[in-house]
């Protein structure tokens, strides 16, 4: 079951990095433009 834990940690780290990069940008661009 170690693989499951490692996968969860990897996804969590990627999510945190993604959020950090996303929030680092100024909220000038509307969220509707992404979709």
UniProtKB/Swiss-Prot annotation:
InterPro entries: PSII_PsbT (IPR001743), PSII_PsbT_sf (IPR037268)
GO biological process, one term: photosynthesis
Pfam families according to UniProt: PsbT
Top-level taxon in the UniProt lineage: Eukaryota
Segments traversing the membrane: 3-23
Cellular component, GO annotation: chloroplast thylakoid membrane; photosystem II reaction center
Keywords assigned: Chloroplast, Membrane, Photosynthesis, Photosystem II, Plastid, Thylakoid, Transmembrane, Transmembrane helix
Keyword Thylakoid attributed: yes
Location(s) in or outside the cell: Plastid, Chloroplast thylakoid membrane
Membrane-related topology note: Single-pass membrane protein
Record's subunit section: PSII is composed of 1 copy each of membrane proteins PsbA, PsbB, PsbC, PsbD, PsbE, PsbF, PsbH, PsbI, PsbJ, PsbK, PsbL, PsbM, PsbT, PsbY, PsbZ, Psb30/Ycf12, at least 3 peripheral proteins of the oxygen-evolving complex and a large number of cofactors. It forms dimeric complexes.
Function field: Found at the monomer-monomer interface of the photosystem II (PS II) dimer, plays a role in assembly and dimerization of PSII. PSII is a light-driven water plastoquinone oxidoreductase, using light energy to abstract electrons from H(2)O, generating a proton gradient subsequently used for ATP formation.
Family the entry assigns: Belongs to the PsbT family.
Protein name in the entry: Photosystem II reaction center protein T
Organism: Coffea arabica
Gene name for this UniProt entry: psbT
């Amino acid at each position: 079951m170690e693989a499951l834990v490692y996968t969860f940690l990897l996804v969590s780290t990627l999510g945190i990095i993604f959020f950090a990069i996303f929030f680092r940008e100024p909220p000038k661009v509307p969220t509707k433009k992404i979709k």
